[in-house]
Amino acid sequence: MFINKTVDGRNNICGLRIAALRRSLKLSQRAFADKLQLMGLDVDKNAIQRMESGQRFITDIELSYIAPALNTTMQELFAPLDH
């Protein structure tokens, strides 16, 4: 059986980490999307919102832009959140 969602129904496992790191940098979703666009990734505020909420899949190519934009590594994006 092929499973493409997390146990809580999310379409990605790093959206919550992306949101936390973005907030720690005091970036709005719009400002983060703008930063990614300047780096060459075609995303908008709505795409960021859907990634962070788990409604959207995130490709490895997108992660290769997102990680440096958040001053982190792709590996760190997959680390569990400390609650």
Question: What are these language model-derived features?
Answer:
Residues 18, 29, 45, 60-63:
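Helix-turn-helix DNA-binding elements, focusing on the entry/boundary residues of the two helices
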Residues 59-76:
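DNA major-groove recognition helix of helix-turn-helix/homeodomain DNA-binding modules
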Residues 23, 37-38, 53, 82:
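Residue-level detection of the helix-turn-helix DNA-binding "recognition helix"
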Residues 26-50:
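Short alpha-helical DNA-recognition segment
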Residues 1-25:
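A short, Lys/Arg-rich alpha-helix, primarily the initiator
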Residues 77-83:
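Phospho-regulated, low-complexity intrinsically disordered regions of nuclear gene-regulatory
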